[in-house]
Amino acid sequence: MENGMTLAYYGLGAGILAILFALYLFSSVLKEDMGNEKMREISQAIFEGAMAYLNRQYKTLIPFALVVFVLLVVGFGYKEGDFGYGLKVGVSFLVGAIASALAGYAGMTSTTKANARTTQAARKSLNAALNVAFRAGGVMGMSVAGLGLLGVSALYIIFKDVHVIDSFAFGASAIAFFARVGGGIYTKAADVGADLVGKVEAGIPEDDPRNPAVIADNVGDNVGDTAGMGADLFESYGATTMAAMLLGLTFAKNHGFSEVLGATFPLLLGAAGIVAAIISTFFVRTSEDGNPQMALNIGLWSTNFITAIFTYIIAQYVFGSEWAPKIFIAVVSGLVVNVAIGSLTEYYTSNLKPPAQKIAEASTTGPATNIISGIAVGMRSTYLPIIVIVAAIMVGYWAAGFYGIALAAMGMLATAAMVVAVDSFGPVADNAGGIAEMAELGPEIRNKTDKLDAVGNTTAAVAKGFAIGSAALTALALFSAYTDLAKTNPNLQKYLVNGKFDLNITDPWVLVGLFLGGTVAFLVAALTMESVGKAAFDMIEEVRRQFREIPGLMEGKARPDYARCVSISTAAAIRQMIAPGLLAVGAPLAIGFILGFKALTGYLAGVTATGVLLAIYMANAGGAWDNAKKYIEAGNLGGKGSDTHKAAVVGDTVGDPFKDTSGPAMNPLMKVAGTFALIIVPLLLF
């Protein structure tokens, strides 16, 4: 028992190591030159806008978190007859929520402090700019993995009870849903407003300082792709670790191991992934004429490879020679999903591949055919990723039952530090290009930042695929843990047959839950899509007003009111994220307590299956529309300004909320359902 608990300290140590490495990376970024006064001014405006949004978002969520904390303390205190137990559950929830918020702050601060420094570094060399942007992204990556592993390990060491700390994952999930949805609404409202009025109506280039929405657009890159994606993967990391620890107890008990060993092995996997990511960070570099994409790919591949080696060594140590190969195979199946989904996402969204090029060709006959082609590409893109995910589920289950499925998810998420680093590289590079344009640094610098931005677009698409795949496996791991934990509820014993739940697909209650789960996924997608439309309308009206009422703005003689546009996006995002958030949390609560365990189980299956398909479809359709436009802008099919290009801009505008708001909202929706069900299943009455 003591030896097993000692292993948890390795997780604690690795979490601390990740945070220390994040601080080292951040300090190295701050040592870089920020450039001239104009660059500093623009960077500061982006930083202030990003912080204003984050502060307002988290202040809005404080009352929600406190209410949930009180309900958890009272609910579990009453059920167990021990309010000390309820307090532990409530504290675990708050730790998860606070850790998620801290990761968001760390990443947002790093990326917004690095943008001008990346632009200035591009004056020296492409490699210098790559290093600054990647180190800034690394701060977010290490913060996500480090705070996640540190939080779970510390709570387990202190409370010594996995069931008590389930709520850590729910705390992370609750914050992640609002961060993902709010961030997606913010970034797309600003993006659509900047593009439609600036590029289409006014005919000015992207990132032109005359565009009133240009600062809000650059803030949005960080809000959506840094804070939003980071919160999403922090949620997956925490939830998967918790589910794997819970299932590890049962696996160890059934196979003659110490229960603590089964629970602490996922912490060791997380530690292995962090060490692998730190080592791989030093492999990311390129030459002046080199390929930045290859440099980042080497970082990802080496992280996967080193994690796999560490996994076998740890599995051999913890489980011995009989089980080590199967445990290793389960974990590696997750690593394979990581690589496979990334490659598939790149294929369906890259402007160098047939799907996006076919959408571009369809644009020659107008916006309608562009939209039809994009929808078809998105739908077609679902089947191969699903086959990959299903294969990992089967391999994981064959290897170690439900514990194997959770370990497959852990294998995928063990590399989260590097994946988040590579994803957060994108907004830094995008902002760096915007600053180069607004500070009028000339085409040579802009060409370098554009090269990094193009890589950032690809890594963002790959990271979206990773987020979807990890969310799917996380949801399944949570589902497995939920059914395992349900066996401990005396009120649900009547559904057990030979130690397993008898839940037939033809049972009306299960079917009701299935349909409700699928419906909620579509409803959240609709609400978030409408939210972008409403927020974008406000932004478009404001940008038009400024062009109309500010004398000399179009001629570049007057300065736009950037702060007004930032304020509009912030207010709209905070206001519009509340309804989808309440639905995501309220649906499983209502179904569980009104319709019962069978319906809640069906709901989890329905929201997961529908959510995964919607997420893949929307993310890939949006990415393909975006890159079809870029393919035309590269000089193909008439190039910029042609009717074909205008049709592609319409498709890209439709695709924006697909890939950056509604699609990504499915990830936390699935996980919120799973983590909340895990919390309430001991309290269900029937």
UniProtKB/Swiss-Prot annotation:
- Give the GO terms filed under biological process for this record: sodium ion transport
Q: What's its top-level EC category? A: translocase
Q: Is-annotated flag, keyword Ion transport?
A: yes
This protein's name: K(+)-stimulated pyrophosphate-energized proton pump
* Cystine crosslinks: none
Family indicated by similarity: Belongs to the H(+)-translocating pyrophosphatase (TC 3.A.10) family. K(+)-stimulated subfamily.
Question: What do we know about how this protein assembles, alone or with others?
Answer: Homodimer.
Site positions for Important for potassium dependence:
A460
Q: Which organism is it from?
A: Carboxydothermus hydrogenoformans (strain ATCC BAA-161 / DSM 6008 / Z-2901)
Lineage top rank: taxon: Bacteria
Does the record bear Lipid metabolism in its keywords? no
Q: Where is this site: Important for ion transport?
A: R180, D225, D232, D660, K671
Query: Record-annotated residues binding substrate?
Result: K188, K659
